[in-house]
């Protein structure tokens, strides 16, 4: 998706480069203040790095910002095999981008949807945690955490509600049909879907929308069943800012109820917004990012963050 917005102070064109990770080349983009803290943005499905442009416009004055097209999206390579989209390889991609652009300073990671899902793999990987100053996760849980969540006794309404919200996951596991849908019209219908379901205007089709949709379904096929049926214990000591969208039609808030078990340094923010709304209208997210980075960089703990912090007695 490409959210077409009128930028009050348009940002300069990004500095583009390619980062090699194994056999895959990743397209990376750099904006902003090279002397500021580094933000690393990871997009979801079926998007590419362009989804972040409204947020980048609000933050580029004070931060160095790096974004990349994940494998299978945008200008990055698009491996053909499902096995090439497994979570450990996606964590390797994250590490490669960090080492290419900020090898000596930890980055503040911000991710949405599938970008958040795959970033959890890196955030919970011991070898990567030293490279991460913080993690802001928007509407994308760790699949292993979800696997443990589902294995515990839950109110049937919660489980049924999440299953109904996740109908698209079953669709993406069907052979051939999802790719054919993206190839033959779904890309052109995508802006209408976002207008009607999310209320987002205006939206235009990205030039790589069809390919992004076709290749991105491999993310689901390579990881969902494996992670949900045989979840791993994935812990992190990285400070996590969890952004819960209470009007999200696809990811329900109760999926994150057990997160303090896995991420003890946790702040939880809630906002009445749909799945893509905070990226299209990013003022609130930009403010939260500024506050969270200021806390980690300078110890500036505002009242809103004090309220959002999840303390052990709340577990």
Q: How should these model regions be labeled?
A:
Residues 29-77:
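Conserved HGGG/HGGXW glycine-rich cap/lid loop of the alpha/beta-hydrolase fold
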Residues 264-315:
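Catalytic active-site module of serine/aspartate enzymes centered on a nucleophile-bearing elbow/loop
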Residues 28, 94-98, 285, 289:
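Generic hydrophobic alpha-helical segments
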Residues 2-14, 24, 47, 51, ...:
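Flexible "cap/lid" subdomain of the alpha/beta-hydrolase fold that forms the substrate-access gate
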Residues 55, 122, 255, 288-292:
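Hydrophobic residues on the short alpha-helix immediately C-terminal to a glycine-rich phosphate/catalytic loop
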Residues 44, 113, 280-281:
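Active-site helix-initiating loop/hinge in glycosyltransferases
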Residues 33-34, 100-105, 296:
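Glycine-rich phosphate-binding loop signature in dinucleotide/nucleotide-binding domains
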